[in-house]
Amino acid sequence: MMSGSNIHFEMAERGRALNYGGIGAIHLMGQRLGLAQEIDRRLQLLKRHLPYHESDHVLNLAYNALLDGQRLEDIELRRNDEAFLDGLGAQRIPDPTTSGDFTRRFDQDSLLTLMEAINATREQVWEKQPEDFLSQAFIDTDGTIAGTLGECKGGMALSYKGIWGYAPLIITLANTREVLYLVNRPGNAVSHEGCVPWIDRATQVGTSTCR
């Protein structure tokens, strides 16, 4: 027999939650490491900061990708997510159109500046690791194929697999699988094309940390 005599009901206030709880931990880590300040110090793309700084745009794009965003338009979902905004302590974030305008301000030099800002912040994490953390550092290079949805985007080409897109060069620290540098190339580029100067640059990252 089902009497239901052990059922209790409680009324609670309406709550808010995130689908991706880890974004808060990532944001907090970036704050403690001073990532935003390092980006703003090095990267100068905006003449005025009303109201956003370079770091606001960079982190906005990064968080969109981390939350499974596939395109700039997906940022609009975050703009209307009060729980997400509260989690970041933000009243608002850049809209998709503003974010698109920001990406078009980049050239090769500014992209390199951004990667170096991230690497400089990354070294703070390495310095806090055990003494033998980077007693040996292994640099890994590889090329991959990044397909696109169109055939008319600037710089793309047909890969040897018959896929239209790009063939980015990825330079990583094999010890931790961290991407140190990412270099975009046409889809028909061979894996090793242009890798030597980037390997040389990667060997300079974290030299003060290697023991």
Report each predicted region and the residues it spans:
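Dynamic "connector" segments at or just before major functional cores
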Residues: 1-209
